[in-house]
Amino acid sequence: MSVRAVGRVLSMALLLIICLPAWAICRLFGGGDFWVRFYLGCVAWLLGLRIKVEGQPVTGKALYASNHISWLDIPAIGGTVPARFIAKSEIAGWSLIGWLAKIGGSVFVRRQKRSEARVQADAVTAALHEGRPLVLFPEAGTGDGVKLTPFRASLFAAANEAGVIVQPVAVDYGTRSAEIAWPDGARFANEVKRMLNRPAPVRVVLHFLDPLDGATMDRKQLAARTHAEISGALGLS
């Protein structure tokens, strides 16, 4: 790894050593969310992300539905809003990454098991009732930064059943989107190294678009509407 990459890794490790005890103490009193957001925000900055927020993020019981370009989307969004992430179940077993995801309150789902779609939606519904926003990447994978892939509708059922707001979120790296994108089939470790070695800061705009009433739309309508709104914000429609 380059000197830049080593410096970033050491800085993130030191930051974790500082934040983790503070998070643990706050958890004893039912808190800790601030430290998760603070850590992710610092990680985003260390990785060269310069974040601009457009629109007003909703708070409380809500589902953010976002396009997914890179693993950098997670510190970008998680460092901006106090939200938990819906993640594929495999991540729970990824040593350090899985451990950090659990600390952050991620909800793990098995998306490949269509037979368990009802169970997964129920788990997300229960998490929404806890009052902290959830982030869903309905493409169920990363895009190429040029176009949106179709949104999977199954987990939108949770928003309908919980009767919560669904807010489309467009993550936009501008002309750098294709460069930042996680290529299909690329290994996670290789993508981490690539981003750690990347020299120049990159501007990312988080567009928090007009919220939708999840109680009045079914899962397919929510998937179609959020896809259309995000496509429009990114200039892809």
Locations of regions flagged by a protein language model:
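A transmembrane-helix-recognition feature enriched in membrane-embedded lipid enzymes
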Residues: 1-52, 99-104
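Residue-level preference for the first positions of well-ordered beta-strands
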Residues: 61-63, 106, 131-137
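A cross-family acyltransferase "interaction/gating" segment
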Residues: 96-98, 145-221
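Polar-ligand-bearing catalytic/cofactor-coordination segments
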Residues: 108-110, 209-215, 229-231
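Conserved H-X4-D acyltransferase segment
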Residues: 36-89, 100-101, 144
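Membrane-embedded segments
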Residues: 74-123, 128
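Catalytic-site beta-strand/loop segments enriched in glycine and acidic/polar residues
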Residues: 127-156
